[in-house]
């Protein structure tokens, strides 16, 4: 059964925003309580967060569909809906997030680094928030916005300081098992290692990690063997260690040709030219292996490599190797810029989102694109005439109608707001200039303009009293 997965496709859905509430305050002896509809809650985000305790993407291989909770709708009495709960998905350190086209969206390195893969929708405003001096009792509320839907790919690139590379059965797993406490599978046949193994090595005051990469063969960079699947795990390593088999039984192979083949594959893969290299001649406990190591060592040193003769089985030469690796790792760490865990947002919001465009398409349709118009359309309940009128007023104030006229739109032309796959299309009817004033104030409650009964009765009594007083003052006795 598969226990290690380093590449998955993930389908994430953020929560939808809750709808706003349209309600009027009702209380005894308060006939004009006014609007008191609360706002809807925000939908939950889907967040990828690096967790050091997670080492594989196996969970997302089995269940690739993940969804955050929706925001709750607002209620009367100025009660706002509850926000949806964010869905936090733990991922291994070194996870790369890509879109469907293969573009890198985020590179998550460092414990706690987070990435918002899908943003929750905003909650709709209740009618209490929409009330104004001109619109005193709105009979509508705004709808909550839908959450983001994203299809993303996750790739794990192991975060290690040292990578052991070499032919299958060169002794890489044996070497990492004696340098660290790792317990990889070890056997005397090729491709025993099917997944990268990580081990932690302590050399003096330096602690570093070593990755045992599955064996490489000629053509690995083009997908032969297992190389293409796991070469990306070498990308983050600071030091490359060539593990060469000095006791191979294959007559056409020798340490120098093995080194040339592996270097060719690394060069074809790309991006690894500046990594420092160390050559390890393994299996010197075998008599023929010791002799071969002494023969090829001068040639390797002439090429500029630091060479170490070791035996993972007999534990020979390991201390010198571990301290040499620690020195190179410390140098690489000192030269590396400090990385801080940051919360990455998939689409940063612009400070000014008031811009929009109007284009005329070949079929005569006018298309409006812009953050505000598209958001307003998503928030509108088209079953409510008052809400549609409110949308018309907002678009008019933004200048959409002016641009439509300049683009050549006429009464009855088709207008679409939004992208082709999710647009609202309607027949355009130009509004009257200052339409809100000419057509009446939408959402106005005329009871606010009428005199209140108690005040009217008080005025009537005062008028009767004044009239009686005047009659009394003008009374002349016989």
UniProtKB/Swiss-Prot annotation:
Keywords: Cell membrane, Cytoplasm, GTP-binding, Hydrolase, Magnesium, Membrane, Metal-binding, Nucleotide-binding. It holds the Pfam family MMR_HSR1. Residues 439-450, 457-468 have a biased composition (Basic and acidic residues). This is GTPase Obg. InterPro entries: G_OBG, GTP-bd, GTP-bd_Obg/CgtA, GTP-bd_prot_GTP1/OBG_C_sf, GTP1-OBG_CS, GTP1_OBG_dom, GTP1_OBG_dom_sf, OBG_GTPase. Its main location: cytoplasm. Residues 2-159 form the Obg domain. Its EC number is 3.6.5.-. HAMAP family: GTPase_Obg. GTP binds at residues 166-173, 191-195, 212-215, 282-285, 311-313. Monomer. Signal peptide: none annotated. Disruption phenotype: Essential for growth, it cannot be disrupted. Its cofactor is Mg(2+). Residues 348-430 form the OCT domain. It is found in: Cytoplasm; Cell membrane. GO terms for cellular component: cytoplasm; plasma membrane. Changing residue 281 to I: No phenotype upon overexpression. Mg(2+) binds at residues 173, 193. Induction: Expressed during vegetative growth it disappears during stationary phase and sporulation (at protein level). Changing residue 172 to N: No phenotype upon overexpression. GO terms for molecular function: GTP binding; GTPase activity; magnesium ion binding.
């Amino acid at each position: 059964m598969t226990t290690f997965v380093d590449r998955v496709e993930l389908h994430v859905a953020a929560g939808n925003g809750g709808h706003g509430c349209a309600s009027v305050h009702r209380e005894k002896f308060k006939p004009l309580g006014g609007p008191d509809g609360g706002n809807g809650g925000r939908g939950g985000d889907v967040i990828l967060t690096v967790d050091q305790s997670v080492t594989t993407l196996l969970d997302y291989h089995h269940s690739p569909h993940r969804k955050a909770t929706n925001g709750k709708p607002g209620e009367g009495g100025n009660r706002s809906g509850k926000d949806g709960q964010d869905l936090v998905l733990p991922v291994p350190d070194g996870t790369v997030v890509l879109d469907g086209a293969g573009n890198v969206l985020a590179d998550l390195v460092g414990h706690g680094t987070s990435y918002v893969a899908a943003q929750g929708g905003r909650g709709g405003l209740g009618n209490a928030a929409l009330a104004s001096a001109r619109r005193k009792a709105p009979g509508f509320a705004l709808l909550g916005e839908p959450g983001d839907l994203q299809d993303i790919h996750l790739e794990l690139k192991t975060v290690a300081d040292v990578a052991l590379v070499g032919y299958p059965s060169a002794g890489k797993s044996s070497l990492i098992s004696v340098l660290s406490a790792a317990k990889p599978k070890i056997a005397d046949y090729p491709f025993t290692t099917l997944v990268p193994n990580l081990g932690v090595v302590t050399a003096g005051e330096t602690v570093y990690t070593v990755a045992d990469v599955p064996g490489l063969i000629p053509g690995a960079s083009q997908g032969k063997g297992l190389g293409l699947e796991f070469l990306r795990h070498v990308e983050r390593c600071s030091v490359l260690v060539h593990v060469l088999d000095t006791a191979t039984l294959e007559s056409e192979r020798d340490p120098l040709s093995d080194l040339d083949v592996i270097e060719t594959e690394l060069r074809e893969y790309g991006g690894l030219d500046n990594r420092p290299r160390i050559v390890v001649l393994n299996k010197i406990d075998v008599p023929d292996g010791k002799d071969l190591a002494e023969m090829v060592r001068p040639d390797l040193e002439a090429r500029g490599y630091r060479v170490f003769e070791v035996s993972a089985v007999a534990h020979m030469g390991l201390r010198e190797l571990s301290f040499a690796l620690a020195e190179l790792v410390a140098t690489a760490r000192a030269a590396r810029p400090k990385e801080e865990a940051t919360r990455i947002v998939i689409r940063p919001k612009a400070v000014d989102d008031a811009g929009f465009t109007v284009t005329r398409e070949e079929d005569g349709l006018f298309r409006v694109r812009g953050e505000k118009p598209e958001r307003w359309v998503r928030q509108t309940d088209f079953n409510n005439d008052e809400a549609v009128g409110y949308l018309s007023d907002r678009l008019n104030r933004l200048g959409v109608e002016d641009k439509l006229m300049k683009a050549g739109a006429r009464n009855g032309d088709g207008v679409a707001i939004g992208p082709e796959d999710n647009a609202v299309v309607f027949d355009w009817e130009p509004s009257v200039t200052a339409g809100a004033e000419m057509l009446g104030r939408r959402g106005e409650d005329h009871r606010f303009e009428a005199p209140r009964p108690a005040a009217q009765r008080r005025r009537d009594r005062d008028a009767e009293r004044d009239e009686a007083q005047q009659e009394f003052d003008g009374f002349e006795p016989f």
